[in-house]
Every structure is written in C-alpha cells, then in structure tokens.
C-alpha cells in the first residue's frame, strides 16, 4: 500500500514541497532565509491579529489604545514588541535573502525572482502603513512626508495624494484605511509567497556553485528540515533577546509623543530598514527626481537578470565580482547611516556619492567586470 502522505490530496502537496522534495546536497545556511521569512510572516500575522483585537484606528484613541495594550492587556507589551521587532527581523532576513540571490545568481530563475521583487514591495508597503498606526509624532509626519512624495507625479499628483489621504491632510480617514490595508496585506503576501515557492519548485533550488545539481539531490526531510529548525531557533533567540532586553533599540523616541500636526519633529526619518532608500531620495535636490530614484532603488532588482553578462551563474569563482558585491553591501550600509543623519555637510555629499555608486555598481561596473572575468578565462 502506498504511503498516505503520497496519495492524500492535501498531504501530497505538503509532501512534494517539504518532505520528498529533491534538494541540492550542497546548499549552505544562506538558503535558510526563505524558511525564516515564512516564520517571520507567521509571527507577524499572529501577533498582529492579537494587537488588532485591542487597537482602535481612530486619531483620538489610536495612541491611547497602544498605551492600553502595553499597560493593561495581559502580555500586551510582549505582543506589541514582538510585532515591532519582528518587523526588523523580517527585513534583516529579507535583505540577506535578496543578497544571497544576487551573490549566487538565483535571479536567473526569472519568475521566482520577479515574484520576490513584488513581495519586497508588498512587505515594504505593509511595514510603512504599520508604522503609521501607533499615531505618534514620527508615525504622523512619516505618513505626511512619504505620501506627499506622490504629489511629484505630473498632472495627477496632487489629486492622487488627496485621494490617498481621504481629505486635505493625513487624518482619521488616512489612519482607518492604512489599518485596513495593513491588516489585509500580510495575507496577500502569504499568497504571493505560495506562488514564489510554486515557481521555485518548477526549477528546483540553485546552489552555491551555480552548477546544475540534478545529478546529486537529497530529500528535503530530514536534512534541510533539521537545518531550518536550527535557523528558526536562532531567529527566535535573537528576536526574544531584542524584545526582552532592549525593545526600543530600533525604534524612534519621537514616536512616544502623540501625533501633533502643529509641531514638526526636528528630524523626520523612517524606520531603519527604509533609511537606505530614504538617503537616495534625499540625495537628489529635485522632488520628482528623488521620487524616481527612490522607486528605482528597489525596481533595479528587476533589471539585474538582464545585466548578467558572466558565463558563470554564481559569484563563487569570480573574485572581482565578489569584491564589487561587498563594496555594494558597504555602500548600502553607508546609505543606511546617512539616511538617519540630518541634512547638512558632510552628510549631503556622502549620501550623493553613495547613491551614485549604488546605481553605477549595479548598472555599469558589475556587468563590465563580469565581461572582463570571461575574458580572463578566455571564454
């Protein structure tokens, strides 16, 4: 008799995705982040659900309801900080996951990669709207500044902004709709993640060497299930340490002041995971130019597969490309630092140089270096 897990209509889907799935025998811990992102999403949906039970999306009571959650709800402080810091862990895993894809040439699976770029946009939109909900000073002014960027779109800009606001400023209508979208988007993200996996399992995983691994596959369970569980334990250890020892480490003190439209904070800045894009936005003195650069800083990922000029897929055996990759990482860290600094000398020029280098590396320097490496190998 055939095993039930191979015949049952529901169980055979799970079986072919997580148990009997043929996986390359040499994938490293950099391949753990997909499953960690799944765990992050589950944590965010669960903690978010419990927060939504006590939160009120009204400008008069939003701030108080968050205070009430932290003070009066059983373990409300824990749920709130798990959710806030869970977002940071989510983005750390996301950036490492994307970095892995860039380093090992996983972007050659076009459908999987494009769904991934779409997922990145969806997660960023969700995080932005979630940051507005506590209705602190940074929530309000962050929402005002970022939504106002859309007014740079020619002809329809100002109408579009008022349509998103639901009025002539960020107010009750804005908060209510942001809460509604913040609630529904994670479920859309979960569905997209399913499609992401579906496309991945059409081709199978890439591996560090970038070579075809059909000749050497091992079953996903028990090898990679155990490996993933180790990753999950480390993720939970990091998250709980952050939540229990320094829950406000990554937050902004300004957000502990209720939103006040009459008082602008001295430095308006988003959460740390948006700072690199924010720095690129600020480095261009023109409003429309800044908005375009902001959008392109993420959209550029969709262009990467078409800029792959190397005869090798992975960077594992390409030392020059490796150097450039780590320069790109250092550049992104520099942009993240600049995004959190005030707009004054020398931060302005550093931000502008780092922004130029970011686009130059991806669009020009890395493709040319790949051609040079092909030449060295007489390919």
Curated annotation (Swiss-Prot):
One of the record's GO molecular function terms: metal ion binding
Cofactor: heme b
Bilayer-crossing regions: 33-53, 77-98, 113-133, 178-198, 226-246, 288-308, 320-340, 347-367
Keywords: Electron transport, Heme, Iron, Membrane, Metal-binding, Mitochondrion, Mitochondrion inner membrane, Respiratory chain, Transmembrane, Transmembrane helix, Transport, Ubiquinone
Membrane topology of this protein: Multi-pass membrane protein
Binding, heme b b566: 97, 196
Documented effect of changing residue 234 to F: In strain: Isolate IZEA-5326, Isolate IZEA-5381 and Isolate IZEA-5561
The protein's assembly and partners: The cytochrome bc1 complex contains 11 subunits: 3 respiratory subunits (MT-CYB, CYC1 and UQCRFS1), 2 core proteins (UQCRC1 and UQCRC2) and 6 low-molecular weight proteins (UQCRH/QCR6, UQCRB/QCR7, UQCRQ/QCR8, UQCR10/QCR9, UQCR11/QCR10 and a cleavage product of UQCRFS1). This cytochrome bc1 complex then forms a dimer.
Annotated function: Component of the ubiquinol-cytochrome c reductase complex (complex III or cytochrome b-c1 complex) that is part of the mitochondrial respiratory chain. The b-c1 complex mediates electron transfer from ubiquinol to cytochrome c. Contributes to the generation of a proton gradient across the mitochondrial membrane that is then used for ATP synthesis.
Protein name in UniProt: Cytochrome b
Species annotation: Sorex araneus (Eurasian common shrew)
């Amino acid at each position: 008799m055939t095993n039930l897990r191979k015949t049952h209509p529901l169980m055979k889907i799970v079986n072919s995705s997580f148990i009997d799935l043929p996986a390359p025998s040499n994938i490293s811990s950099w391949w753990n982040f997909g499953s960690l992102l799944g765990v992050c999403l589950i944590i965010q949906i669960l903690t978010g659900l419990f927060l939504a039970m006590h939160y009120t999306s009204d400008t008069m009571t939003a701030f108080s309801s968050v205070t009430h959650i932290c003070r009066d709800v059983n373990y409300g402080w824990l749920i709130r900080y798990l959710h806030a810091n869970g977002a940071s862990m989510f983005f750390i895993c996301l950036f490492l996951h994307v970095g892995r894809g860039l380093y090992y040439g996983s972007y050659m699976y076009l459908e999987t990669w494009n769904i991934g770029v779409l997922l990145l946009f969806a997660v960023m939109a969700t995080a932005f709207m979630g940051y507005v909900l506590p209705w602190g000073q940074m929530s309000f002014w962050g929402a005002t500044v970022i939504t106002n960027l859309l007014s740079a779109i020619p002809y329809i800009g100002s109408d579009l902004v008022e349509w998103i606001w639901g009025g002539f400023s960020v107010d009750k209508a804005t908060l209510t709709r942001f809460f509604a979208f913040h609630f529904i988007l994670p479920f859309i993200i979960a569905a997209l993640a399913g499609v992401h996996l579906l496309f991945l399992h059409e081709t199978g995983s890439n591996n560090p060497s970038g070579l075809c691994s059909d000749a050497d596959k091992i079953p996903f369970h028990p090898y990679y299930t155990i490996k993933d569980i180790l990753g999950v334990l480390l993720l939970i250890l990091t998250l709980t340490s952050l939540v229990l020892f320094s829950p406000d480490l990554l937050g902004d003190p300004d957000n502990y002041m209720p939103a006040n439209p009459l008082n602008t904070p001295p430095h308006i800045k988003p959460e740390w995971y948006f700072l690199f894009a924010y720095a690129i936005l600020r480095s261009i003195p023109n409003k429309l130019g800044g908005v375009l650069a902001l959008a392109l800083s993420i959209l550029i990922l969709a262009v990467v597969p078409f800029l792959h000029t190397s005869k090798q897929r992975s960077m594992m055996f390409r030392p020059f490309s490796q150097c450039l990759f780590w320069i790109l990482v250092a550049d992104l860290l520099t942009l993240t630092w600049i995004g959190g600094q005030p707009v004054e000398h020398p931060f302005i020029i550093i931000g502008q140089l780092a922004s130029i280098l970011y686009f130059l590396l991806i669009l020009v320097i890395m493709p040319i270096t790949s051609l040079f490496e092909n030449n060295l190998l007489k390919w």
